[in-house]
């Protein structure tokens, strides 16, 4: 029987979300290939150079804090230009350790399983005309590849970029589950609603990526429904979170709050910014929830 799952990965462990339970496993790390493709209307080219994060985030116009590829997973990026000029840019993928995430990048056909692999690369140059849309799939070379996780960014000029990343899990050619998250800006603070209930198999998770070229320290303040602080988490894995690195966890892994209503506030160092996404697993179904880029004044 197949699993409906999404992988939340830290440097040491990978949390596999299944329909019935949460199980821990350590995935293999593979270098994944990439397909060569061009388009007359909007050429797509690949960069085979490493793409390190930058201290200047002004050129970063979209951030996706969670990307899953392999083990049945494909991540599809939908990028839209709602501006009045053409958009020139580059999609860059980075793994959880801050290294270039080599995958197969292509514009997907109707059946994601039919996309052939190509030469390995961690980035793709993009040109989107005004009002245009581009779909780009990130996938492994074959169905037997282990799952890898990381994050992605788009650096661009011109136009106005919007987008979403959709994770889809395919087993034996059949789509089993799908979930999407919107592109977001880097933030200094993020508040996430929490409504955990282990009886209902409902858990709140988060993924954080450091898009800068310097360390960032992040603490998590847990508030109850009345807004009172009940716990402050200073996790070694987040203090610091190194340049280009990413981590994904469920709150109850670190606070043991299996049945809890309230919120968690992620606070980065003053002047530092991170990319954050939040997801809720309930009864084996995954959905994205809002990340609010603000906090109550008393939360520090």
Which residues fall in each region the model found?
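Gly/Pro-rich, tryptophan- and cysteine-flecked surface segments typical
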Residues: 25-300
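Short hydrophobic/aromatic segments of transmembrane alpha-helices and their interfaces
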Residues: 11-14, 70
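Bacterial N-terminal signal peptides
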Residues: 14-28
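N-terminal secretory signal peptides that target proteins for export/translocation
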Residues: 1-9
């Amino acid at each position: 029987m197949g699993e409906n799952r999404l992988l939340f990965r830290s440097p040491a462990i990978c949390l596999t979300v299944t329909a019935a339970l949460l199980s821990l496993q350590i995935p293999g790390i593979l270098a994944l290939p990439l397909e060569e493709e061009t388009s007359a209307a909007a050429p797509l080219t690949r960069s085979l150079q490493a793409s390190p994060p930058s201290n200047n985030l002004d050129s970063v116009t979209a951030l996706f804090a969670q990307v899953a590829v392999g083990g049945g997973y494909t991540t599809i990026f939908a990028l839209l230009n709602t501006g009045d000029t053409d958009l020139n840019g580059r999609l860059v993928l980075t793994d959880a350790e801050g290294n270039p995430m080599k995958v197969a990048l292509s514009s997907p056909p109707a059946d994601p399983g039919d996309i052939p692999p190509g030469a390995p690369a961690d980035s793709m140059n993009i040109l989107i005309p005004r009002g245009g849309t581009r779909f780009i799939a990130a996938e492994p070379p074959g169905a037997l590849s282990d799952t890898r996780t990381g994050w992605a960014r788009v650096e661009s000029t011109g136009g106005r970029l919007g987008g979403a990343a959709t994770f889809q899990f395919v087993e034996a050619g059949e789509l089993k589950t799908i979930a999407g998250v919107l592109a977001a800006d880097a933030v200094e603070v993020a508040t996430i609603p929490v409504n955990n209930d282990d009886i209902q198999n409902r858990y709140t998770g988060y993924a954080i990526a450091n898009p800068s070229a310097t360390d960032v320290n992040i603490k998590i303040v847990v508030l109850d429904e009345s807004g009172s602080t009940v716990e402050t988490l200073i996790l070694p894995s987040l203090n610091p979170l190194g340049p280009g690195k990413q981590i994904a966890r469920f709150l109850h892994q670190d606070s043991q709050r299996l049945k809890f209503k309230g919120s968690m506030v992620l606070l980065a160092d003053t002047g530092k910014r991170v990319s954050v996404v939040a997801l809720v697993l309930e009864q084996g179904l995954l959905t994205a929830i809002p990340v609010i880029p603000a906090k109550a004044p008393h939360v520090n």
